[in-house]
């Protein structure tokens, strides 16, 4: 079995897959290294024979996590690294090492699955959008704040915006003009997110052609599903790219 980890800005997503068929047998989300170790300790009975990860954290933070993983399981950890090219996709950044690794793996995975031009939108803490031509040329992309970041910035920098998570969840039941602060903020942020997604789709159709494949991934992908009815939602898209970057026999 193979342990896979996606170490993002806010959360660590992990799963254990059957090395043969790639079927997920366990998985979870952790908000800290300690929480991750606690979750994985409960699965020490699984015969994990290999581990691979992608991290957008600092080298020091990543190294510390790797050391903890190697103490927990008898494995050497493979770590995804930046590249100019992978699986037929050419990195479109002028400085290829500056493209976030999770973003790179997601767009590589999108092209690998589509085998044609594609738009990949990852809706997490930040929202990223990347366009890949049919020949594997990464045209570049965009980054904007995600729902949680927009919400937290308004709460932090606007004194009179105060509400709890329960109010936030209730507010998301409609897009009718808000009649309370939570409704106004939550619905306003969601409309901004949906507007960004619509604009990305229009640009993809212009640059890549109307038949391009659309992929949505990330924790907030379901919030914009209605905007792109033909999009494919693939929660583990980064893990698909990770397998291409760090193949294990």
From Swiss-Prot:
Keyword Transmembrane helix: no
InterPro entries the UniProt entry points to: ATPase_NBD, Type_III_PanK
Protein's UniProt keywords contain Transmembrane: no
Residues bound to substrate: 93, 100-103, 181
Keywords on record: ATP-binding, Coenzyme A biosynthesis, Cytoplasm, Kinase, Metal-binding, Nucleotide-binding, Potassium, Transferase
Gene Ontology biological process terms in this record: coenzyme A biosynthetic process
Record text on subunit structure and interactions: Homodimer.
Family: Belongs to the type III pantothenate kinase family.
Protein name per Swiss-Prot or TrEMBL: Type III pantothenate kinase
Organism name: Pseudomonas paraeruginosa (strain DSM 24068 / PA7) (Pseudomonas aeruginosa (strain PA7))
